[in-house]
UniProtKB/Swiss-Prot annotation:
It comes from Conus quercinus. Residues 53-55 are annotated as: Ser-Xaa-Pro motif, crucial for potent interaction with nAChR. Residues 1-21 form the signal peptide. This is Alpha-conotoxin QcIA. Negative results: shows no or weak inhibitory activity on a range of nAChRs subtypes, including human and rat alpha-9-alpha-10, mouse alpha-1-beta-1-delta-epsilon, rat alpha-7, rat alpha-6/alpha-3-beta-2-beta-3, rat alpha-3-beta-4, rat alpha-4-beta-2, and rat alpha-9-alpha-10. Belongs to the conotoxin A superfamily. Expressed by the venom duct. Residues 22-48, 66-83 form a propeptide. GO terms for molecular function: acetylcholine receptor inhibitor activity; ion channel regulator activity; toxin activity. The keyword Signal applies.
Length: 83
């Protein structure tokens, strides 16, 4: 086997390793993004619940609590929009 053939096989091995590593990394990033999104949703829900249970926070941020109430009771059409 000549030097040129050995070098070609070496490049082929490096390229295939890079491709496999790149695709595996992208697949794991997709799973991480989904987990991050779920964690962010849980954090937002906790902050929303704590704010809406505190009258001064609920008064300061009515857009958050109004949205929470509408999600809990979507048939309630009597809610006035916040100014």
């Amino acid at each position: 086997m000549g030097m040129r053939m050995m070098f070609t096989l070496f490049l082929l091995a490096v390229l295939s390793t890079t491709v496999v590593s790149f695709t595996l990394d992208r697949a794991s990033n997709g799973r991480d993004a989904a987990a991050d999104s779920k964690a962010a949703d849980q954090i937002a829900q906790t902050v929303r619940d704590e704010c809406c249970s505190n009258p001064s926070c609920a008064q300061t941020h009515p857009e958050i609590c109004r949205r929470t109430l509408m999600l809990q009771n979507p048939l309630n059409h009597d809610m006035s929009p916040s100014a």
